[in-house]
Amino acid sequence: MKHLLASLLVPCVILALLIAACSEDDPTGPNDLGGETNLELTQVGQEFPISISVPGTQSILSELKDSIVITANDGGIVTMRGIVGFDSAWVRGLEAELGISALPIPSKRAILETYMQRFGAVIDSTDKQAMTMRVDAKLKVTSEGMQEFVSSGGDLSRPFTIVKYDMNVGDSWEFTDADGVKITRTVVSKSTTDDYEVGFWYLKVIKVEETREDPLMEKITYVTNHKFGLVGVHMLTKTGKEIKTIVFPPTL
């Protein structure tokens, strides 16, 4: 059980991030989001394969068995379900890779519960050779940007912006999540050429960096494309490791 508690942290973070995106009440503010909502990208049934790696290493994260599927779309409010599968051997390997093996059980449990509550994850560990974790989350995706409801605890009246495609480098905004934690997001780069690799393709992207108080992560960078939405998430851990997730849009 202690290995399970420690090792589910990263998958929980990854899934919740992959099914995120944002907006606000002020019509001129960074969290206001308009645009077309009837997009091929977000039709029910669309599936988003992912690839996870830690550059410079043969990370056990690359073995993660995943499935992320759109299960509902109500006027641009999209429900995505992420499911990851793993076994006890993978769990032990991830614990060692994260360098958290020495933490006492109560500390591991507290960290895990923080993420589980934040992202509403459900774990089935009945069969230690075929464990699963499921995350269901709602987001808003339009032709103008993306919004997420994870930070508001699922409150659809409080979306928070990950990106608006007309933003520029240096644009920055802050908000407080459902737990009272201040989150800052800043546009750190905007491509003028196709320079971000997604499989066999190169895309123009906007990178938005997020900082917040977090037990494991120093910062998170969301990588988005104006046509394909979220195509990458880069997480920098407090121990200096970069966890790089590439998202393969079904319409690419």
Model-based region annotation:
Residues M1-V10:
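Bacterial N-terminal signal peptides that target proteins for export
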Residues L18-A21:
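C-terminal motif of bacterial Sec signal peptides marking the signal peptidase cleavage site
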Residues S23-L252:
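Conserved functional acidic sites
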